[in-house]
Design a protein with these regions (language model features):
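Short, low-complexity N-terminal intrinsically disordered segments enriched in polar/charged residues
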Residues: 1-33, 37-41
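Short beta-strand edge/turn micro-motifs at domain boundaries
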Residues: 2, 95, 118-155
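A solvent-exposed, acidic/Ser-Thr-rich amphipathic alpha-helical stretch
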Residues: 36-104
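Short aromatic-glycine motifs in intrinsically disordered, low-complexity regions
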Residues: 73, 110-114, 126
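Short beta-strand or tight-loop elements
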Residues: 79-82, 117-121
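Short, exposed interaction segments that mediate macromolecular assembly or regulatory contacts
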Residues: 99, 112-117
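Short, cysteine-centered beta-strand-loop-beta hairpins and adjacent loop/turn segments enriched
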Residues: 103-113, 144
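Acidic/histidine-enriched, glycine/proline-rich intrinsically disordered or flexible terminal extensions
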Residues: 147-180
Length: 180
């Protein structure tokens, strides 16, 4: 029988990877709920974000995205990070390419529209004061698809389901409140 040993360095790197992944998840939840304060926790102070529609201070992006989404009629959205390649460039730095899929329902002059966007977040992460967060982000869009929405809020069994919201009235806030 062979025994396997894992070094403390390997354990520490695993913890670092998990901290980076957790940061990516905070970003997704923050942007989906249009929660600027939660969104800011994904970025170091002074970080930058280039999203095309916005290129500048990441904390300003966190304040910008809610009013911007409202101005284009966003009613619901889901950001997913499906997988991420994390390469450490030093003890406290990493570059991360994470694949993103976003689903958006928006109210337009022609009715509800559905968009799917596939892209990647190209991030420079840094660990400062023990916290892994984004220092710089570039969003790269690889493809998109736009079509009339077939969203059905009232039909069949949908009418009785709890509804997701893009604000702090979403059901998840009550569930997660003791932990935040």
């Amino acid at each position: 029988m062979t025994t396997m040993s894992v070094s403390q360095q390997e354990i520490d790197r695993f913890k670092d990877r998990q901290a980076i992944y957790d940061c990516l998840m905070r970003y997704c939840r923050g942007v989906d709920r249009l929660d600027a304060e939660l969104l800011k926790t994904a970025y170091h102070e002074g970080a930058t974000d280039d999203h095309g529609i916005f290129n500048g201070d990441a904390w300003e992006f966190a304040e910008f995205i809610g009013p911007f989404d409202a101005s284009i009629g966003v009613r619901q959205q889901t950001h997913r990070v499906d997988h991420a390649l994390i390469e450490f460039t030093g003890p406290d730095s990493a570059v991360v390419e994470s694949y993103n899929l976003t689903f958006i329902d928006a109210e337009t002059e022609d009715g509800m529209a559905a968009a799917m966007v596939g892209g990647r977040y190209l991030d420079c992460f840094e660990r400062r004061d023990g916290a892994w967060k984004i220092a710089h982000r570039l969003y790269v869009m690889d493809w998109n698809r736009n079509e009339p929405s077939t969203v059905d809020w009232e039909g069949s069994f949908f009418k009785d389901l709890a509804r997701g919201r893009i604000d702090d009235q979403d059901e998840s806030y009550a569930l997660l409140a003791p932990f935040t």
